[in-house]
């Protein structure tokens, strides 16, 4: 699971998943979707991508537990297995915005150890495993932190954290001299952070599939990442570049 071929396999799986997503982007009129909760959607594109990724993972890594945002499942008893987000930012995807991403991460006892994500409309694939450093489109790269003077942080919102509480978090970040942006896509925001295009990302109440890949990717890029379960199936994450992390 932790050899070099695992990342290559994930990158290949993501390339095909991204192509599926791009095909759906070209036929948006055929998209159908349901609102799972306020502001949270699942489309037929989500389901097709997750179905493909599950099958590809089962073939490449047989016998491993799999959990996905749309099709459910469970990790093993010791919280080990794959976590899939077929389309993070589904509302953006439905609207035709380029801010959406696909994520596949492997966790061991709840900790992210290996993962890859794709931002298809930007032709970006990021991947990492513990101790390996960051890979961009399959090539090892050295991440460049953002300028310390340009403090822009992304904030996530979801159906778990009340809007007023999220606004309070935003106010706290502004008090630390951050400009706060909200892209409604955790995986995209964490990818941009890992590439040094944001100072970081904060969200309370995201799913494991949102951070299973991006968590280890941000760590291997050189960021400080803290995450913990705050309710069953819900996580808090704070990922920032070291110079930007408050004490």
Tell what function each PLM region has:
Residues 145-247:
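An extended, acidic
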Residues 47, 70, 86-89, 120, ...:
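Generic detector of well-ordered alpha-helical packing
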Residues 76-135:
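DPxDG-like acidic metal-binding loop motif
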Residues 1-87:
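N-terminal subdomain of lithium-sensitive/metallo-dependent phosphomonoesterases centered on the IMPase/IPPase/PAP
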Residues 64-65, 81-82, 114, 152, ...:
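Structural motif
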Residues 20-24, 46, 57, 90, ...:
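Residue-level signal for inorganic ion chemistry
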Residues 136-143:
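A structural micro-motif at secondary-structure boundaries
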């Amino acid at each position: 699971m932790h050899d070099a071929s695992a990342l290559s396999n994930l990158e290949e799986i993501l390339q095909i998943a991204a192509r599926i997503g791009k095909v759906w982007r070209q036929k948006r009129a055929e998209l159908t979707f349901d609102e799972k909760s306020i502001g949270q959607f699942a489309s037929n594109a989500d389901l097709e991508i997750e179905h493909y990724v599950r099958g590809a993972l089962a073939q490449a890594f047989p016998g491993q537990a799999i959990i996905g945002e749309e099709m459910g499942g469970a990790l093993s008893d010791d919280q080990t297995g794959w976590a899939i987000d077929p389309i993070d930012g589904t509302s953006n995807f439905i609207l035709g915005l380029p801010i959406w991403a696909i994520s596949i991460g492997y966790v061991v006892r709840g900790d992210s150890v290996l993962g890859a994500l794709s931002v298809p409309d930007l032709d970006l694939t990021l991947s990492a495993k513990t101790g390996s450093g960051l890979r961009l489109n399959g090539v090892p790269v050295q991440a460049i932190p953002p300028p310390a003077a340009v403090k822009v942080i992304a904030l996530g919102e979801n159906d778990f954290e009340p809007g007023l509480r999220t606004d309070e978090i935003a106010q706290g970040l502004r008090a630390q001299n951050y400009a706060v942006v909200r892209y409604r896509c955790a995986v995209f925001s964490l990818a941009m952070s890992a590439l040094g295009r944001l100072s970081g990302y904060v969200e309370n109440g995201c799913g494991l599939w949102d951070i299973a890949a991006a968590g280890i990717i941000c760590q291997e890029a050189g960021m400080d990442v803290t995450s913990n379960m705050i309710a069953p199936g819900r996580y808090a994450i704070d990922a920032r570049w070291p110079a930007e992390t408050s004490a």
